[in-house]
């Protein structure tokens, strides 16, 4: 065999190992803790449980934050019983990492299991067909990791290929899809379980008059887990709901220190610059233009490129209402474009990496309920956007699936 023949043979083998079509979302499952906190009464609970009722002016500020948050309720593992038993969690700056870790290493994979079981049930295939696991959390760090723990909890095969992502932050719902997309498309027959599980036990802390950015986080964050089954070339018995056609990641210019999280003896501290909404809205147009150019124009599919940003569906991480408001204004979006995102923010708060997967699930369900033509609010193309530390933006170009109305 000549060198050219050997090279051609190797190329053929590599091609045979790859899938034919794009990565596809085959099922979605979500889960939340049992404890529900109404946003309207949360300031009273928060300042009472942290013994901070004497901070009357700060409580008024916090109440206004909660009123303007666009949130109706949130779910959290932490409750009065846990917090009273662990008062170090209620101080702003007290050594508490061991307590937080002890909670997170148990509850993060447990909540991930609940979401995964729902996704596997919807998928309808035996869990033995799961070939890969991608797990993401910003809540705690451990070895072996939450991926190992979830593998044990679900009874997955010990040979499942695992990837654990810790400390990524709010953009990571896009990151896990980007990574899982590459895995699914480059491994023929792969079925990837993607899990994001977030618990606020690592960030909960009492109020501080000198760190209002931390107070913003206390007004926004909630607990939740989402799981997705991803694979290319769906079988007849599988029911795809979205295709992943392109993905990218960007560090926005002049954004150093805009969103930071630091793991300390006191837990995970959260720092937020006031101009985060402005930085994101200023750059989002270029991010989308670059994505569309790469996905459509440079790949020979210019005729498929949507005419405008109002001709696509939007799944945007709800970092807070100000981000959504300024992106809407900058991109001149119709009010309904962020409806799915705002619905999830209202019902669950900011669940960090899990949010965009909750929104994806909500969108396909509402599209079917409203008898629209596709899983993407009746439209063919859409974007999923994750915003987080860096300041990083993750972008995934989605194609919806036709619904049998």
Swiss-Prot record:
GO terms for molecular function: naringenin-chalcone synthase activity. Keywords: Acyltransferase, Flavonoid biosynthesis, Transferase. Transmembrane segments: none annotated. GO terms for biological process: flavonoid biosynthetic process; polyketide biosynthetic process. The keyword Transcription does not apply. It comes from the Eukaryota. PROSITE patterns: CHALCONE_SYNTH (PS00441). InterPro entries: Chalcone/stilbene_synt_C, Chalcone/stilbene_synt_N, Chalcone/stilbene_synthase_AS, Polyketide_synthase_type-III, Thiolase-like. Pathway: Secondary metabolite biosynthesis; flavonoid biosynthesis. The primary product of this enzyme is 4,2',4',6'-tetrahydroxychalcone (also termed naringenin-chalcone or chalcone) which can under specific conditions spontaneously isomerize into naringenin. This is Chalcone synthase. The gene is CHS.
